[in-house]
């Protein structure tokens, strides 16, 4: 988490620091973040597994007046989209004319599929072992 704070400072000029919670209870996480939110300009959630991550992020976005992002979902999706766009340039293809397969549509895979679709991907397949 400290490393993520360094990246925020280095690449975006944002001052940040990690706050680690010793709970996996959805209500406790939401209450703790809501209590400290007025002192922050944004909240970056990290290492919250699905399906809890969806409810926590959605509720915090609805209840707070600052940006809330679950990095495991959206940070991963942005990196995948950037890499895919650059790879497709090399092979002279576009998102709209390739087949994309995502193995394991958990929190990150689901967010990747949503972002790729918004970016113009037309043929996305999600595979799950269950």
Feature map (PLM): residue ranges:
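N-terminal ligand-binding/catalytic initiation module
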Residues: 1-66
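Gly/Ser/Thr-rich loops at beta-strand to alpha-helix junctions
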Residues: 46-53, 74-75, 105-110
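Glycine-rich phosphate/diphosphate-binding loop of Rossmann-like nucleotide-binding domains
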Residues: 1-12, 78-130
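A glycine-rich helix N-cap at a beta->alpha junction
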Residues: 38-39, 45, 68-69, 116, ...
